[in-house]
Amino acid sequence: MDLLFSFRECARRCAALLFSGVMALGAVAQTAHAIGGVVRARYEIQTLDGRSRFAIRNSRVWIRGSFMPRLSYYVSTDLCDQGAFQFLDAYGKLDLGRGVAMQAGQFRIPFGVDPFRGPGNYIFADRSFIGRDIDNIRADGVQASYTFQKDIPATVTLGVFSPNTITDQNHWSKTLNYALKAELPVGPFKVTGGLQTIQPDSVRVNMADACVSFSKGGLTAEAEYILEHYVADPFPDCHSYNVWVDYGIPLEHTLFNRLSFQARFDASTSHSSGVVTNGRLSEDHPARKRLTIGSTLGYVNKPVKCELQVNYQKYFYKEGYAAPDGRQDKVVAELIVLF
């Protein structure tokens, strides 16, 4: 009887193991993968000297997917960023349940709002000073996020990263970069705040971000501010802000289905990237202001989007400053294809 009981118990356990294996295979069989990308081709001409160029601003490709309901991945690269190849993102994400998620790999540090817009979702042909110069940071590290489940629909994200650039992953260091980001939607508004501390060289740089976004009907508006403080260095604090509005109307009986108009004012005081030269920080970007106006004609049928965009940018510098090509008054015409 004992032998028969043992046999039955063994058979029961084997059946349970086989069933769980079949279920696991079923979960794997339900994997989902998708390939996407965006191409941005442009022509721009400087209005002061008539110099112009054609360029492929981005030719970005990505693949994303999941191997089971709570495990996903994302990889992206830019095959032509103004002629240069860039490997951008590679990470895995684990949904632990109850609003908790973990992400590890190479990705954008969780800080700021405008920097998180991809080239297929830019509001303007050129990124804001905040998105391009002040906080354009990808790094290798890990982050954890928590989304409140009940009364407060907020998400809080905390990340820890290597201080070196993504092209120098063999560098060992005694310091780390840290970032904290909180997002709270309130009706048509979304309030975002964050703190970040990085050390790209021997000087630590502390940053604080605040942003309010609004979206209702065809109107979208946003105002973002970043304070950047250089610890134990005489370089003055950098103040950056970005304010913009977009208004779109639907179109019927045409190839395109949306027409929108945009306006933006962004600025920053003198800025350093945090790299020390001759014992102290140097200025990488001068104090500047910019006014941008534009219009976009778009066909949107997710996940496909095609846009024709025209922008005029007016720059303001201190008297006597000779702005480099691309950072002067100009008109930009761009074709964007997202798939």
Q: Predicted segment positions?
A:
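N-terminal secretory signal peptides that target proteins for export/translocation
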Residues: 1-11
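Outer-membrane beta-barrel pore domains
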Residues: 47-50, 93-95, 106, 115-117, ...
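Interfacial loop-to-helix transition and helix-capping segments at the boundaries
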Residues: 169-175, 205, 238
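Disordered, low-complexity tails and leader-like regions
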Residues: 3-4, 19, 299
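Bacterial N-terminal signal peptides
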Residues: 13-26
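Positively charged, low-complexity intrinsically disordered regions
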Residues: 9, 13-14, 291
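Initiator methionine at the very start of the polypeptide chain
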Residues: 1, 29-30
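Outer membrane beta-barrel
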Residues: 31-165, 174-178, 182-190, 244-248, ...
